[in-house]
C-alpha cells in the first residue's frame, strides 16, 4: 500500500518488497487503494534482497520485528537508512505496547469502508516522509539511533 500511496500522492518512484510476502496483492489492501482512486491490481509482491536494499535511499518497514529481521538477515549497516513507517520521526523508548506497528489489513474482516477510514493516516504519512526525504519537514530518525532496543524485539513476531 505504501508504495502505491507514495507514487500516487508524491509523484515519485518507490520500490516495494517484503520479508514475508505472498504471490499477489492482498485483496483488502487492493480494495482500500481502489477506494482512494489507485489501481494496484497488477502488483506482484517481491521479497526483499540485499541488492534491493543497496539500491534504495531509505527502507520503511511496518513494525519493530521487521526492522530486527532486516538487519539480522542483511546487516547492521542498513540501520542508517531503515525506518519505522508508523512513526519515522521519533526515537522509540519502548516497543512494549505495539504503538510502532502497522497492522496488516489482510487480517481484518471489517468492510472496506471501515478499513479505508482506519488507514487514512497512511496517506498523510507518505507525504510527510517524502517531505523529510526532500529535506523539508521533520527529520527522519533511523534505526541506527535505537538499534539495541530494536534487537530486543522478537524478530519473528508480527
PLM ranges: what are they?
Residues 61-62:
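Short beta-strand scaffold positions
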Residues 58, 70-158:
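Phosphate-binding/catalytic loops
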Residues 1-56, 131-140, 155:
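Conserved active-site segments centered on acidic
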Amino acid at each position: 500500500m505504501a508504495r502505491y500511496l507514495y507514487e500516487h500522492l508524491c509523484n515519485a518512484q518507490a520500490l516495494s518488497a517484503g520479508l514475508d510476502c505472498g504471490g499477489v496483492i492482498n485483496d483488502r489492501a487492493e480494495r482500500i487503494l481502489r477506494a482512494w482512486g489507485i489501481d494496484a491490481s497488477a502488483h506482484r509482491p517481491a521479497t526483499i534482497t540485499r541488492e534491493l536494499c543497496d539500491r534504495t535511499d531509505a527502507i520503511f518497514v511496518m513494525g519493530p520485528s521487521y526492522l530486527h529481521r532486516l538487519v539480522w538477515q542483511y546487516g547492521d549497516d542498513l540501520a542508517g537508512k531503515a525506518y519505522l513507517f508508523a512513526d519515522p520521526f521519533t526515537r522509540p523508548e519502548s516497543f512494549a505496547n505495539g504503538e510502532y506497528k502497522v497492522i496488516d489489513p489482510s487480517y481484518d474482516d471489517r468492510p472496506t469502508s471501515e478499513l479505508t477510514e482506519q488507514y487514512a493516516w497512511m496517506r498523510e504519512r507518505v507525504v510527510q516522509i517524502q517531505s523529510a526525504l526532500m529535506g523539508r519537514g521533520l527529520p527522519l530518525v533511523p534505526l541506527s539511533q535505537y538499534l539495541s532496543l530494536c534487537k530486543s524485539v522478537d524478530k519473528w513476531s508480527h
